[in-house]
Amino acid sequence: MAALTVAEADRATRHAALVLALCLPGDIVLYLLLPLFPEIFDLTLPEVGLLLAANRLVRIVGYQWVARLYATSGPRFTCLLAVGATIIATFGYTLLSDVWALLVLRLMWGLAFAGLNIANHALASSVAVDVSRRAGRARGIIAAGPTLGLLAGALLAEFAGVRSVFLVLGLVAIPALFFAWRLPAEPEGIAAGAPAVSWPNALNVWAFCAGFTLDGIFIVGLAITVAAHQPEGAILAAGAAMALRFGLEVVLSPVSGAWGERTGARRLLVASSLVASFGLALVGLADISGYDAVLWAGLLTTIVLRAVLQPLPAPVVAETFPGPARLPALAAQSTWRDIGAGLGPLATGFLLPLVAPAATYGLAALLLAGAGLALVGSRPR
């Protein structure tokens, strides 16, 4: 790919973010509806956990292949292919039942998201100037899709039925083809020989722990926790709580990106990880204290800090691995986050019925805090 100007990088990043914003709702709404209505899809709760983890787990082996496809075929082709797979998968949720049929759709979406995610990270960091600002604005655009999708999906499911939600979301994904077509067509080179999963550095350890705790335990437990405390109108309450997570990303991600540009993305990532771990600890403490105020304080703290963290990994990776090493480093970081986020739902399904929530969320808090502190001692190359 020819070197982009700052304006071209801004425009390409914006289009890639719009593509992902239109495609994400079909996936995110599953995290709301599958745990609450497994019987509609002929599923058991363990099968729900498997399906919610499958799209992450397939990227463990698929991310490096998708990164090579992106590097050789370019953002436009990769994202057009991914949008097509997304549309098929989302419409499939309208028609199909049974764990094996749905598993195929989840694997298809997992690889599609890999391409969309690499495009967003790579284009945001394609020009060294203003990477944090560009990534923050992109995260804000991306988060708007799931925010509106969760709110609309909860209302549709309540009054029109669960299956109708995915028919609408499949239609919503179709305009993403237009924005994908406007992405740069030229491919970008990639450093050869990088293994799909190598020995993790400090950034990869942090990515794993963030995926395991914030994307796994916290997100999967969010709908269940809110529904347990709000039995009346559970789907609307859970949908609103999950939408708040993405709504705050719309507001806070651009602010976080600009803040990271001024103060240093690595420093802000460490500080935000520590405060997010405090929020997880509060969620666990609410189980002991019995106070709803403690629960909501923990949920809000974790949601806010997760939004702050979202745009920060890409500029930290770009700082640590400059030049052509950036793409494989981004793929490795995303792979380790997916490993954590894939194992998180599986662990949650086993831990919550057997172990007190205070212990589960306390362990999550310790993992995230430790991974954040480990970044203090690591240095850019």
Task: List where the protein language model places each region.
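Intracellular juxtamembrane helix-capping segments at the cytosolic ends
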Residues: 115-128, 308-322
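Short amphipathic helix-loop junctions that connect adjacent transmembrane helices
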Residues: 32-46, 220-237
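Loop-to-transmembrane helix entry
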Residues: 43-54, 133-137, 230-247, 294
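Structural signature of the two symmetry-related core transmembrane helices
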Residues: 77-91, 170, 267-282
